[in-house]
Amino acid sequence: MDLDLTQTWSVLGWLEQAIDAKGVETCLLTYAARFGLSALFAGWVPRLDPSIASDISSRILFQKLPPEWAARYNKQNYVFLDPVVQRLQTDRNLFSWTDAYNSCSSSNDVKRVGGEASEFGLVDGLVVPIQSVDGALAAFSFGGGRLELGEEDAAAFAVVTNFAAGRL
């Protein structure tokens, strides 16, 4: 059986050569761009408890978003309304923002967070949850104007993102 893993080793090689978190972020965004994704938010997933709002900034690993959207999201504590974060409370599988919006019990949260994100060109995205051996949960949420991802691409995206997380 002939396997051509050239692309896989190339992408993992970029990540291996990244010397810091900024380099990992750049590699991930370069990889994500081929699927229509241009933004990245990653961090340790909080429980949905507004009393921990002051602790949220310490959980952020990457926040490469349109600056105005990042400021609004953080100032308004949208993390506690975000359908993506709500879904992460129970789902450890890769999913799209559309999946999160469709499964959200609050249409108001979908309209508020999803609607406002779309004003900044963040219409759809892909979320890769990463469960640590210690029980902590991180998630990498990639967003953009469109999500063009087949089933095999999604599995490969998860491999790349998990490898990147291991580089942090």
Report the location of each language-model feature.
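Regulatory sensory and allosteric helical modules in signal-transduction proteins
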Residues: 60-108, 114-118
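Short hydrophobic beta-strand micro-motif common in sensory/regulatory domains
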Residues: 124-130
